[in-house]
Curated annotation (Swiss-Prot):
Protein name: TCF3 fusion partner homolog
Organism: Mus musculus (Mouse)
GO MF entries: DNA binding; protein kinase binding
Described function: Appears to promote apoptosis in a p53/TP53-independent manner. Putative regulatory component of the chromatin remodeling INO80 complex which is involved in transcriptional regulation, DNA replication and probably DNA repair.
Top-level taxon of the source organism: Eukaryota
Length: 259
C-alpha cells in the first residue's frame, strides 16, 4: 500500500512540473534562459537607431528618383534633337535632288542649243551668208517689267527722233538698217529665223514687212502695227509688197538629231 501511494505522489509531481498551465498551449522552455532572444532584440534596437531607418531609406529613394528623372529628361531631349536633325537632313537631301535635276535639265537644253547653233552656222556658211559681219541689238526684258532701252554705240547715232514714244521691242524692230540682216543672224545670236519659202502661206508673224521708198532712204522700217492701222483701211500706193523674186529662197531645213 505504501509503495502504491509513493508512486502515485511522484507521478502527480512529475505531471505538474512538465505540464502547461491550464488554458495555455504546450510550449518548450527557451534555450539558455532566453539570452539569445534578448541579444537579438538589443541588436535590432541598435540597428534601427544606427541611422539606417525609415528616414535614411526615404532620402535615398528620393535621390534615386531624382537621378532617374534627370536621365529620363536628358534622353527625351536627345531624342527630340536627333529627330529634328533627321528632318532637316531629309529636307536638305530633297533640295539637293531638285537642284541636281534642274542642272541636268539646263545641261540638256544647253547641249541642244549648241547643236542648233552649229547646224545653222553650217547651213548659213553653205549659202555664203555674211552673218558674222552683221551687227544688231538684243533687248533683254524681265517678265512683267518695262526694260530700259540702252542703245549700243553702233546704232545710237542712227536712231530717228520719231521713235521715242515706242516700246523697246517696237523700237528694235523699227531701227533696223536695211543693209543689216534680221535679228538672230549675227555671230552672238542665239535664235535665228528662217526665211519662208516662196509661195508658202505666211502667218502674220512671218509676213514680209512692207517698206516704202522713204523708209529705205532713212534706214527705218515702218511696221503696220506701229501706225495703228485698222484691218479695213486701204494702204497708200507707196506701200508695196516685196517682189517674190527678191526673197531669199531658203529651202526647208531638217532639224539636227538630238540626244
Amino acid at each position: 500500500m505504501e509503495l502504491e501511494q509513493r508512486e502515485g505522489t511522484m507521478a502527480a509531481v512529475g505531471f505538474e512540473e512538465f505540464s502547461a498551465p491550464p488554458g495555455s498551449e504546450l510550449a518548450l522552455p527557451p534555450l539558455f534562459g532566453g539570452h539569445i532572444l534578448e541579444s537579438e532584440l538589443e541588436t535590432e534596437v541598435e540597428f534601427v537607431s544606427g541611422g539606417l531607418g525609415d528616414s535614411g531609406l526615404r532620402e535615398r529613394d528620393e535621390e534615386e528618383e531624382a537621378a532617374r528623372g534627370r536621365r529620363r529628361r536628358q534622353r527625351e531631349l536627345n531624342r527630340r534633337k536627333y529627330q529634328a536633325l533627321g528632318r532637316r537632313c531629309r529636307e536638305i537631301e530633297q533640295v539637293n535632288e531638285r537642284v541636281l535635276n534642274r542642272l541636268h535639265q539646263v545641261q540638256r537644253i544647253t547641249r541642244r542649243l549648241q547643236q542648233e547653233r552649229r547646224f545653222l552656222m553650217r547651213v548659213l556658211d553653205s549659202y555664203g551668208d555674211d552673218y558674222r559681219d552683221s551687227q544688231f541689238t538684243i533687248v533683254l526684258e524681265d517678265d512683267g517689267s518695262q526694260g530700259t532701252d540702252v542703245p549700243t554705240p553702233g546704232n545710237a547715232e542712227n536712231e530717228p527722233p520719231e521713235k521715242e514714244g515706242l516700246s523697246p521691242s517696237q523700237r528694235t524692230t523699227a531701227t533696223l538698217d536695211p543693209t543689216s540682216p534680221a535679228p538672230g543672224e549675227g555671230p552672238s545670236g542665239r535664235k535665228r529665223r528662217r526665211a519662208p519659202r516662196v509661195g508658202a502661206s505666211l502667218t502674220p508673224e512671218l509676213a514680209p514687212v512692207q517698206v516704202g521708198a522713204e523708209g529705205w532712204g532713212q534706214g527705218v522700217i515702218k511696221v503696220e502695227e506701229d501706225f495703228g492701222f485698222e484691218a479695213d483701211e486701204a494702204l497708200d500706193s507707196s506701200w508695196v509688197s516685196r517682189e517674190p523674186d527678191k526673197l531669199l529662197p531658203y529651202p526647208t531645213l531638217a532639224s539636227p538629231p538630238f540626244d
